[in-house]
Amino acid sequence: MLAKRIIPCLDVKDGKTVKGVNFINFRDAGDPVALAAEYSRKGADEIVFLDITASHEKRKTLTDLARRVAAEVNIPFTIGGGVRELEDVSALLAAGADKVSLNSSALKNPNFITEIAKNFGSQVCVCAIDAKENNGKWTCYLNGGRIDTGKDLFVWAKEAENLGAGEILFTSMNHDGVKTGFANEALAKLGQIVNIPVIASGGAGSKEHFKDVFLLGHADAALAASVFHFGEIDISELKTYLRGNRIVVR
């Protein structure tokens, strides 16, 4: 059994880490580089940085941040937000990022996934999907949850895999920031449909939620933000708890 991964997510807006509830109402959660270094020390397996303003405001990517983070942390990290061209990917990887996360750009131009996979390898490409459940149907959203595409979550995840994505990062907008647990039913279904790792995002509020996302949601990795940023859950303690529940972690 592959070890389950714990991944802090740092949403970056105007150079600072922020965390909202259901994609709005941001609180300042500190310097992203300092936070990343702290998480690396505490045993995080990877870190994800998402520039949550980039796609909406059409700004370029986080190359400078990638360079600063690479100098401070020794675990893999992913950067997303405004990645639209191969040059963006190349610049981020050259600056020290291990992977790039695509969301809006992949839905608008699905072949971009294939271009990245061909040029840099599937392992570099994380397809991030923001989805919301309405009347039992999960649909994908664009631009930080502002635009409903009407596209089915499960159909798009399988398409992304076939196009060359190496991982799926699924955020449940219904669960994001509200700390009532992950979307385990949808995650379990997703895990049956795709054959690439699924990262669960949205809903972490307790150590038990992490246990459930692995045992019930069958996620390969769990991503969270505010519970880590504001000290509600310590990563090293979380891993000890998971080991005690017979979940393999690094």
UniProtKB/Swiss-Prot annotation:
Major site of localization recorded for this protein: cytoplasm
Keyword Amino-acid biosynthesis: yes
Cellular component terms per the entry's GO annotation: cytoplasm
Pfam families per the UniProt record, alphabetical: His_biosynth
Enzyme Commission number: 4.3.2.10
Record localization: Cytoplasm
InterPro entries for the chain: Aldolase_TIM, His_biosynth, HisF, IGPS_HisA/HisF, RibuloseP-bd_barrel
MF terms (GO), sorted A to Z: imidazoleglycerol-phosphate synthase activity; lyase activity
UniProt keyword Magnesium present: no
Pathway listed: Amino-acid biosynthesis; L-histidine biosynthesis; L-histidine from 5-phospho-alpha-D-ribose 1-diphosphate: step 5/9
CDD domains in the cross-refs: HisF
Top-rank lineage group of the source organism: Bacteria
Catalytic activity: 5-[(5-phospho-1-deoxy-D-ribulos-1-ylimino)methylamino]-1-(5-phospho-beta-D-ribosyl)imidazole-4-carboxamide + L-glutamine = D-erythro-1-(imidazol-4-yl)glycerol 3-phosphate + 5-amino-1-(5-phospho-beta-D-ribosyl)imidazole-4-carboxamide + L-glutamate + H(+)
Enzyme active site: 11, 130
Key words, A-Z: Amino-acid biosynthesis, Cytoplasm, Histidine biosynthesis, Lyase
Gene3D superfamilies: Aldolase class I
One BP annotation, GO: L-histidine biosynthetic process
Enzyme class, first EC level, given as a word: lyase
Family: Belongs to the HisA/HisF family.
Assembly and interaction partners: Heterodimer of HisH and HisF.
Described purpose of this protein according to its UniProt entry: IGPS catalyzes the conversion of PRFAR and glutamine to IGP, AICAR and glutamate. The HisF subunit catalyzes the cyclization activity that produces IGP and AICAR from PRFAR using the ammonia provided by the HisH subunit.
Protein name as it appears in the record: Imidazole glycerol phosphate synthase subunit HisF
Species the sequence originates in: Elusimicrobium minutum (strain Pei191)
